Amino acid sequence: MNKLSHPNSNEYAEFYAGYVQRATSKGDVLAALPNQIDKIQAALGNLSDEQALFRDAPNEWTIKEVMGHLNDVERVFSYRLLRVSRNDSTPIPGFEQNDYVREAGLAAHPIKDLIQEFEHLRRANILATQNITAEAA
């Protein structure tokens, strides 16, 4: 697996500083990616669909919605990874996560399918990182 360098603060919007700091403070981000598949499976794999509809508060996401959000983010970051790895200098747009979750109809999706989808997306992203050249990293 490649080892990507940590980004400089001028390489990302200030909004992302907290995320970058948390991720880079834990060491090699790429090494952590496969472990998260197992952690999600262990934490959520035995939930029923009814249990996965739990939400902490009326305006909070359900467990299924959190899982759907993780899947959306895997797709978004896959696209961003492709753009950055190809030295595409055009602006990368954001996305409105609450709109994505609201429009996804995640209550109808089995939690096991959402977990499996995450695993496939994450494994594809891990493979994508292995093909990034040192110059692009």
Model-derived features: positions:
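Histidine-centered divalent metal-coordination motifs
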Residues: 69
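Aromatic-glycine hotspot motif
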Residues: 1-63, 75-137
